[in-house]
Amino acid sequence: QTFVTIPGTLRDHPDNLSLAGDGFDTVIKVSCADILTMATR
């Protein structure tokens, strides 16, 4: 549940991703996709 909660929190606070920079934003998006893919398998 921790892995699902963290991306969900980040989605609720887009300002945090913007402050972190586009590079960090991209990493989070990829990580979220990987976690969701693993969760569905």
Curated annotation (Swiss-Prot):
GO biological process: hydrogen peroxide catabolic process
EC number of the protein: 1.11.1.7
Assigned keywords, A-Z: Calcium, Heme, Hydrogen peroxide, Iron, Metal-binding, Oxidoreductase, Peroxidase, Secreted
Single GO MF annotation: metal ion binding
Obligatory cofactor(s): heme b; Ca(2+)
Cofactor remark: Binds 1 heme b (iron(II)-protoporphyrin IX) group per subunit. Binds 2 calcium ions per subunit.
GO cellular component, one term: extracellular region
Name of the top EC class for this enzyme: oxidoreductase
Reactions catalysed, as given in the entry: 2 a phenolic donor + H2O2 = 2 a phenolic radical donor + 2 H2O
Localization annotation: Secreted
Function, as annotated: Removal of H(2)O(2), oxidation of toxic reductants, biosynthesis and degradation of lignin, suberization, auxin catabolism, response to environmental stresses such as wounding, pathogen attack and oxidative stress. These functions might be dependent on each isozyme/isoform in each plant tissue.
Family note: Belongs to the peroxidase family. Classical plant (class III) peroxidase subfamily.
UniProt-recorded name of the protein: Peroxidase 3
Organism this protein belongs to: Vitis vinifera (Grape)
